[in-house]
């Protein structure tokens, strides 16, 4: 497989100006099949941006990823089905869903996350099939949202929209659930268990938890299943700016991961202790990122000029392919300037991988 042929999508983020995001997506649509948007609650509205991108570009769209906490599955199911109405032949909508990251857990407790994701998926699927659902059949959602147990809802207007459901995660429980219930899985390179560090250390098979995914697949009634690898990358003509953005992204990861997860792929406490201490002291992400060694960030996020990124990206995609992944996307932070990053990726990086 050509390395570039694995890369089907690119992930953008709702922190940038909305119209600018749509313009960047227009550039990306010439080289990518899917534009993914992150969902962060405190950023711009993901459904609005995906709708604008779908209507303007005709590219496939997806969430990478949404989550069940603070989200109403009725609204999300409706948004996904509506987006599917904009898809031209050969393109589709993907609902990527996970258990919620640090920005979500800072706002609310993430109780029973695996069960909440499973209920969310089950409710959406029945709504997309046009079936009436009873709220009490989804007890955790019903309780969390204050819904009436005997209330019913249905989407009479849907016609079995083509919405793919993929689950993002790294732990054994979420991956086993993904294998059983979803149409695919997302594993991102900035998580230690699925990182370049895990591959290079020879620990990927031991720490990736993909055996749990396989157990879930054995129980699944769903035929199609796609293993998607998210390559976290930061590219710019300005190497220092690209690397700074990568360190910031890596800081968000090393600050949240249990030390044992980092140690299992070769990181020592001295690699990230100063960064974690700075965040704990309230110094902010940028200040903490300045304390993270670049060589640590490089194991989690590919970064630099286009020339810097090509070799590392090819290496990482090779590992991912050998591990059974068949699809990939370019993920956060993409670059300090999203427009520049997409232009460099499409004009200089991807052609060199062919």
Language-model-detected regions and their locations in the chain:
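Active-site-adjacent structural elements that line small-molecule/cofactor binding pockets in enzymes
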Residues: 1-354
């Amino acid at each position: 497989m050509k390395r570039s042929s694995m890369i089907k999508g690119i992930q953008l983020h709702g922190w940038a100006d909305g119209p600018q995001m749509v313009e960047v997506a227009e550039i990306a649509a010439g080289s990518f099949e899917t534009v993914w948007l992150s969902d962060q609650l405190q950023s711009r509205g993901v459904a609005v941006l995906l709708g604008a991108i779908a209507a303007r570009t005709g590219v496939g769209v997806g969430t990478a990823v949404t989550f069940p906490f603070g989200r109403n599955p009725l609204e999300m199911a409706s948004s996904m089905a509506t987006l599917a109405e904009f898809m031209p032949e050969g393109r589709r909508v993907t609902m990527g869903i996970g258990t919620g990251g640090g920005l979500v857990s800072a706002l609310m407790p993430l109780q029973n996350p695996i069960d909440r994701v499973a209920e969310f998926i089950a409710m959406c699927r029945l709504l997309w099939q046009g079936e009436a659902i009873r709220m009490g059949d989804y007890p955790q959602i019903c309780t969390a949202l204050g819904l009436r147990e005997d209330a019913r809802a249905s989407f009479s207007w849907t016609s079995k929209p083509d919405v793919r459901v993929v689950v993002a995660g790294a732990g054994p429980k979420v991956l086993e659930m993904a294998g059983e219930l979803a149409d695919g899985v997302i594993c991102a390179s900035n998580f230690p268990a699925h990182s370049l560090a895990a591959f290079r250390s020879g620990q990927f098979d031991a720490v990736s938890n993909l055996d749990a995914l396989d157990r879930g697949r054995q129980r699944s009634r769903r035929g199609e299943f796609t293993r998607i690898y998210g390559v976290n990358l930061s590219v710019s003509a300005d190497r220092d700016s690209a690397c700074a953005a990568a360190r910031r992204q890596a800081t968000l990861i090393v600050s949240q991961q249990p030390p044992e997860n980092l140690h299992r792929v070769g990181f020592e406490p001295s690699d990230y202790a100063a960064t974690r201490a700075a965040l704990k002291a309230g110094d902010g992400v940028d200040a903490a990122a300045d304390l993270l060694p670049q060589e640590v960030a490089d194991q989690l996020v590919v970064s630099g000029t286009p020339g810097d990124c090509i070799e590392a990206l090819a290496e990482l995609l090779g590992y991912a392919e050998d591990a059974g992944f068949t699809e990939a996307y370019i993920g956060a932070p993409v670059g300090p300037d999203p427009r520049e990053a997409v232009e460099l990726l499409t004009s200089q990086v991807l052609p060199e991988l062919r």
